[in-house]
Amino acid sequence: MKAADVRALSADQLKDELAKLKKEQFNLRFQKATGQLEKSSRINEVRKDIARVKTIARQKAAEAKA
């Protein structure tokens, strides 16, 4: 997910997206542990997407306070 796409989301949508990504990350870790994971690079992609969502959510919260 690109940063521009994330910036277009509202605060509630960001929370939903973050929850979805964390669930996906959990499932990927579980697949890795059981040897069923096909694309190991997806773990890093999801981790970076989570960071993107958290960063933009924090920026939006700071803008709202200012």
Swiss-Prot record:
<dbReference type="InterPro" id="IPR050063">
    <property type="entry name" value="Ribosomal_protein_uL29"/>
</dbReference>
<dbReference type="InterPro" id="IPR036049">
    <property type="entry name" value="Ribosomal_uL29_sf"/>
</dbReference>
<dbReference type="GO" id="GO:0003735">
    <property type="term" value="F:structural constituent of ribosome"/>
</dbReference>
<keyword id="KW-0687">Ribonucleoprotein</keyword>
<protein>
    <recommendedName>
        <fullName>Large ribosomal subunit protein uL29</fullName>
    </recommendedName>
</protein>
<keyword id="KW-0689">Ribosomal protein</keyword>
<dbReference type="GO" id="GO:0006412">
    <property type="term" value="P:translation"/>
</dbReference>
<dbReference type="Pfam" id="PF00831">
    <property type="entry name" value="Ribosomal_L29"/>
</dbReference>
<dbReference type="GO" id="GO:0022625">
    <property type="term" value="C:cytosolic large ribosomal subunit"/>
</dbReference>
<dbReference type="InterPro" id="IPR001854">
    <property type="entry name" value="Ribosomal_uL29"/>
</dbReference>
<comment type="similarity">
    <text>Belongs to the universal ribosomal protein uL29 family.</text>
</comment>
<dbReference type="InterPro" id="IPR018254">
    <property type="entry name" value="Ribosomal_uL29_CS"/>
</dbReference>
